[in-house]
Amino acid sequence: MNEIPINEKAALPLGEKYALTIKEAAIYFNIGNKKLRRLAENNLGRFALESGNRFLIIRPKFEQFLSQSTSI
């Protein structure tokens, strides 16, 4: 049988993920980790979520934020 182990994660391309970690977002948007973390801390609820000590960037909302910003 071709069963997939339960503990093995299905890897999605970054462009298909709804929420990205700071590290993934830094790679996807070509923005530094520190800058993204600062943006996430200052924009909780707008395009960022906090899960414990981890920030998640909501990709579609962050894309919209970037398209409306002249500088970050």
Where are these regions (language model features)?
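A short, Lys/Arg-enriched interface patch at domain edges and termini
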Residues: 4-5, 62-72
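Hydrophobic alpha-helical segments with strong N-terminal bias
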Residues: 5-8, 43
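Short, structured secondary-structure boundary patches
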Residues: 22, 40, 55-59, 70-71
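Major-groove DNA-recognition helix of helix-turn-helix-type DNA-binding domains
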Residues: 27-56, 63-64
